[in-house]
Swiss-Prot record:
Protein family: Belongs to the AdoMet synthase family.
Keywords from the UniProt entry: ATP-binding, Cytoplasm, Magnesium, Metal-binding, Nucleotide-binding, One-carbon metabolism, Potassium, Transferase
Residues annotated as binding ATP: 15, 171-173, 248-249, 257, 263-264, 280, 284
Signal peptide as annotated in the record: none
Pathway: Amino-acid biosynthesis; S-adenosyl-L-methionine biosynthesis; S-adenosyl-L-methionine from L-methionine: step 1/1
Role according to the record: Catalyzes the formation of S-adenosylmethionine (AdoMet) from methionine and ATP. The overall synthetic reaction is composed of two sequential steps, AdoMet formation and the subsequent tripolyphosphate hydrolysis which occurs prior to release of AdoMet from the enzyme.
GO cellular component terms attached to this protein's record: cytoplasm
Compartments, record wording: Cytoplasm
Name assigned to this protein: S-adenosylmethionine synthase
Residue stretches in coiled coil: none
Pfam families: S-AdoMet_synt_C, S-AdoMet_synt_M, S-AdoMet_synt_N
Enzyme Commission number, as recorded: 2.5.1.6
SUPFAM superfamilies listed in its UniProt record: S-adenosylmethionine synthetase (SSF55973)
Amino acid sequence: MSRYVFTSESVTEGHPDKICDQVSDAVLDALLAQDPSSRVACETVVNTGLCMITGEVTSKAQVDFIHLVRNVIKEIGYSGARAGGFDANSCAVLVALDQQSPDIAQGVNEADDHAGDPLDLVGAGDQGIMFGYACNETPELMPLPISLAHRLSRRLAEVRHNGTLGYLLPDGKTQVSVVYENDKPVSIDTILISTQHTAEVDGISDEQGIRERITEDLWTHVVEPATADLALKPSREATKYLVNPTGKFVVGGPQGDAGLTGRKIIVDTYGGYARHGGGAFSGKDPTKVDRSAAYAARYVAKCLVAAGLAERAEVQLSYAIGVAKPVSILVESFGTSALANDALTALVQEHFDLRPGAIIETFGLRNLPQQRGGCFYQDTAAYGHFGRNDLNAPWEDVTAKSQELKQVAAA
């Protein structure tokens, strides 16, 4: 019997790197909502009293970027008396956006391998490799460690926003360690929560007292509600439970650490449980295969698992800049499928169109911000891009396609 512990982490929307992801995706949303053909590559950096957006944009949209940035920061919770050294109302906002390189635009606008099919006209925005993954550990077909970590971080933000724990501040992280036996989760080994808080907590000012109060409050208001519907639950007796191990966490957010777009790519995906091609998502329009092809790879993997063709599936895609068709497609089932990996790969090649133009059209990626009231990608930028029931993301809707695959495999 094999036994091991696997750990994944999540961060709250107030983590400095996640502020940047949300700002970059808010810029993307605003541009696509007005002009769905916008080309966007927006990077954000934050530090004490500063937020800068930079990158390349080609769009007909007219956006007040400074107002937009301040609104995002305020929504997260950095404003007013408790904002510390990073206040939406007073921080410096710098905008340094250029146009997309004509050399890159040329390859995206007209693919090198087009042959009359309109979907062949959209070439990949860059070379690269992307991975998608799914497994049957959770109803959303995600690995349990990252699923639990996201549940905790989202609940941590929720009790801050609704005032249940009024002493909480925006910055926070969670980490969950799960025990596996024969590749199946059997128990929760450790839960770690680090959360920013006010200097005094409900009138308590000594460090030990603050830590004890937060520890009890988080178990009652975060851990228990976040895991209440799970068959595999943590317990105070059996699960190691750590809260703010350094003792206190008062200085946080961009005042404590600088943040950058794209530095939480493992949090954004599968918590390290599957491979990652290295490309970040936020701030990138759908012609960037770092984003759109990663969504497609998740869709393919989830379809295979939902169809019962594998218990675990990892899909690798690769692209060349300016070329529409993938350079390679590979499926790995880790021995959990009755079909060989090459047979699964052939099935994917036959039944999924993975050209960038087809991915954009299948999921409606250019029009999602417009259809969702001007905000879609910003919502993906915290708490993961996959396994999210709240987003109604098109790459998570596999009902029809998985049934099609099941019928094909049974024939």
